[in-house]
Curated annotation (Swiss-Prot):
Pfam families: RRM_1
Domain RRM: 16-99, 108-188, 399-477
Gene Ontology terms: cellular component: cytoplasm; nucleus; ribonucleoprotein complex
The protein's name: CUGBP Elav-like family member 2
One of the GO biological process terms: regulation of alternative mRNA splicing, via spliceosome
UniProtKB keywords: Cytoplasm, mRNA processing, Nucleus, Repeat, Repressor, RNA-binding
GN (gene name): CELF2
Location of the region described as Necessary for splicing activity in the Swiss-Prot/TrEMBL record: 188-240
Necessary for nuclear localization and splicing activity: region residues: 426-484
The organism's taxonomic lineage, starting at the top: Eukaryota, Metazoa, Chordata, Craniata, Vertebrata
Length: 484
């Protein structure tokens, strides 16, 4: 038989040559034919053989061509990854041969939407046959057998399908339809995977949103004065400040990790699918946007400050989630810094200085990322807030914080960097002993609004650095006898 079973007549024009792996090396074409013929007439079987051996030995794989495409697809559905042949450890692998991939069905298959429910398959064929040979035409129907108003049409070549799209898409409005006819390439497996990832991301964000608002009930202990300020802050003009609280409440390391993984996958799929329309800004900020507060992400009119807070808060969130249980978990900060190019090989040690270095570099990495994504916005915000270091300017009532248990090494810039993500800092000061010129390990931070101060208290009070836990509370009013 010379390695093949041939017939005088030819297979259908759309017949598929299929590669089959995981077959016994002892099997001949005859045994393989008996395996495949239940699914349809076999045109040809070629067993791949090692010609370096005498006689040539089977490599345990072959090519099979059925007379019809339908038979090949039925065989693949019944055998691929399902049936294990005698003496084999793995199930049969059956897929179109590489030579078939250039003309894959998904490259020639069209989705037709907004089709009149009165149309049948013949009507669709008549409509699209002027553009080339149609291999398959199928109207989607419900369990009741009635048309769902859409169909699939597969042409012999991709060029035919493209011509049909150009001529027919939105060319007419069919009877009983509210919009013009839709003609586009049917979703590929890659498209379906991308959509699945996006749905997972949306679900994750919904869960996070629910958990976040649930945790905001912890603010119920605020005085009526602060509740009024919170209500005022939720107005459109102050939404950026309020989003800081939403970001700080209810997030944990697992949620952040899951969100980051899904967003990166979805962004990569989206970028590869639309390279011609890619925008450097949208591409860079897309993944970050998916991880920011749901409020900030869904508000088109968020202020420049809100956008900046969303970017810078990401680093703090990850750091807070991972670092609150002590030095051994400072790797969370290190990972965030490394992601953004901010961590050197010697950034971590077991001492307090190493902890400070990792923390500082994590913030530095976030700033570098933000600067690359939004250069103008970042530079403006940075200039405004850098001047706050060392200043003792006070904000409005309820916006001034007292922080103690600060590490000895912390200076004005360090405390500024730590509290910037929660809002617009107008002053940040670490108090120094004038005689020793060493830090007294406490300081003050003032915001331009009380909401940011409350967000900072929620996130930073009890935050552990080295062997110390920060204590963050509102600075007492000037009318009180003590500052704290």
């Amino acid at each position: 038989m010379n390695g093949a079973l041939d017939h005088s007549d030819q297979p259908d024009p759309d017949a598929i040559k299929t590669f089959v792996g995981q077959i016994p090396r002892s099997w001949s074409e005859k045994e393989l034919k008996e395996l495949f013929e239940p699914y349809g007439a076999v045109y040809q079987i070629n067993v791949l053989r090692d010609r370096s051996q005498n006689p040539p030995q089977s490599k345990g794989c072959c090519f099979v061509t059925f007379y019809t495409r339908k038979a090949a697809l039925e065989a693949q559905n019944a055998l691929h990854n399902i049936k294990t042949l005698p003496g084999m450890h793995h199930p049969i692998q059956m897929k179109p041969a590489d030579s078939e991939k250039s003309n894959a069905v998904e490259d020639r298959k069209l989705f037709i939407g907004m089709v009149s429910k009165k149309c049948n398959e013949n009507d669709i064929r008549v409509m699209f046959s002027p553009f080339g040979q149609i291999e398959e035409c199928r109207i989607l129907r419900g369990p009741d057998g009635l048309s769902r108003g859409c169909a699939f049409v597969t042409f012999s070549t991709r060029a035919m399908a493209q011509n049909a799209i150009k001529a027919m898409h939105q060319s007419q409005t069919m009877e009983g339809c509210s919009s013009p006819i839709v003609v586009k390439f049917a979703d590929t497996q890659k498209d379906k995977e991308q959509r699945r990832l996006q749905q997972q991301l949306a679900q994750q964000m919904q869960q996070l949103n629910t958990a976040t608002w649930g945790n905001l009930t912890g603010l119920g202990g605020l005085t009526p004065q602060y509740l009024a300020l919170l209500q005022q802050a939720t107005s459109s003009s102050n939404l950026g400040a309020f989003s800081g609280i939403q970001q700080m409440a209810g997030m944990n390391a697992l949620q952040l990790q899951n969100l980051a993984t899904l967003a990166a996958a979805a962004a990569a799929a989206q970028t590869s699918a639309t390279t011609t329309n890619a925008n450097p800004l949208s591409t860079t900020t897309g993944a970050l946007g998916a991880l920011t507060s749901p409020v900030a992400a869904s508000t088109a009119n968020s202020t420049a400050g809100a956008a900046m807070n969303s970017l810078t808060s990401l680093g703090t969130l990850q750091g807070l989630a991972g670092a609150t249980v002590g030095l051994n978990n400072i790797n969370a900060l290190a990972g965030m810094a490394a992601l953004n190019g901010g961590l050197g090989a010697t950034g971590l040690t077991n001492g307090t200085a190493g902890t400070m270095d990792a923390l500082t570099q994590a913030y530095s990495g976030i700033q570098q990322y933000a600067a690359a994504a939004l250069p103008t916005l970042y530079s403006q915000s940075l200039l405004q807030q850098q001047s706050a270091a060392g200043s003792q300017k006070e904000g409005p009532e309820g916006a001034n914080l007292f922080i103690y248990h600060l590490p000895q090494e912390f200076g004005d810039q360090d405390i500024l960097q730590m509290f910037m993500p929660f809002g617009n800092v107008i002053s940040a000061k670490v108090f120094i002993d004038k005689q020793t010129n060493l830090s007294k390990c406490f300081g003050f931070v003032s915001y331009d609004n009380p909401v940011s101060a409350q967000a900072a208290i929620q996130a930073m009070n009890g935050f552990q650095i080295g062997m110390k836990r920060l204590k963050v509370q509102l600075k007492r009013s000037k009318n009180d006898s003590k500052p704290y």
